A protein has these predicted regions:
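Signal-transmission linkers at sensory-effector interfaces
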Residues: 2-31, 36, 141, 158, ...
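Amphipathic alpha-helical coiled-coil segments that mediate homodimerization
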Residues: 21-29, 34-50, 57, 91
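GAF sensory/regulatory domain recognition
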Residues: 43-50, 55-88, 100, 107-110
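Flexible loop/coil segments at beta-strand boundaries within sensory signal-transduction domains
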Residues: 63-64, 135-140, 149-150, 161
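Signal-transducing coupling segments at domain and membrane junctions
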Residues: 66, 76-79, 105-128, 148-153
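A short, aliphatic-rich beta-strand micro-motif
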Residues: 127-135
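Allosteric cytosolic regulatory segments
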Residues: 164-171
Length: 194
């Protein structure tokens, strides 16, 4: 009974910590209407939560078929990754097509081969990876990719749940920013006609 009580107490503490993180991200998102500001706010918070983890936020432009990387860190440094065409294979294509989270905690080379994935030029092969879709409506518009280049089994079920919740919040904020930009554009067009 004591062990069960301790386990439940620990779970409650962990869940309370997750909710505090989610609330702080929600507060940051509420103050932000620019898309890049949203990428930066969420990306910075994820890096803080996951001990300065390497991560990228990838956005799919369905019109051009390109993947853009508005936020990317590797080895503790912000990096620029050139936009690239979305291929038919790979982790990114799979997540965008299925809208499913992918967790790879071991045997990364095997998982990469199975998915037809490859290491982006100028980046390192990870040992653990977490890919969480950014879904708006019925489409995955992008994803958050969290990686660990040093450890296998880096991501727990609670890590996955937390990142999924943050991705959902980010998706809503990005859609709101997109709609705000569209409304502003239409308003300007209307004013110019009058």
């Amino acid at each position: 009974l004591f062990n069960e009580t301790q386990r439940l107490f620990k779970e409650s503490e962990q869940r309370a910590a997750e909710l505090a993180i989610i609330n702080s991200v929600q507060a940051a998102l509420a103050a932000e209407l620019s898309m890049q500001g949203i990428y930066d706010a969420v990306g910075d918070k994820i890096r803080e939560i996951f001990d300065q983890a390497d991560l990228s936020i990838r956005i799919h432009d369905a019109r051009t078929g390109l993947i853009h990387y508005p936020y990317a860190y590797e080895g503790g440094k912000r990096i620029d990754i050139a936009s690239s065409p979305l291929g038919e294979a790979g982790f990114t294509a799979h997540v965008l097509r299925t809208r499913e989270t992918v967790v790879v905690n071991e045997n990364m080379a095997d998982a990469a081969t199975r998915h037809g994935s490859f290491v982006l030029p100028g980046t390192l092969m990870e040992k653990s990876a977490l890919f969480v879709p950014l879904v708006a409506g019925d489409q995955a518009r992008g994803l958050i990719n969290l990686i660990d280049v040093e450890r296998e089994n880096a991501y727990s079920a609670s890590d996955v749940r937390l990142l999924q919740t943050l991705a959902n919040s980010m998706s809503v904020a990005l859609e709101n920013a997109r709609l705000f930009d569209e409304t502003q554009r239409l308003l300007k067009e209307t004013e110019q006609r009058n």
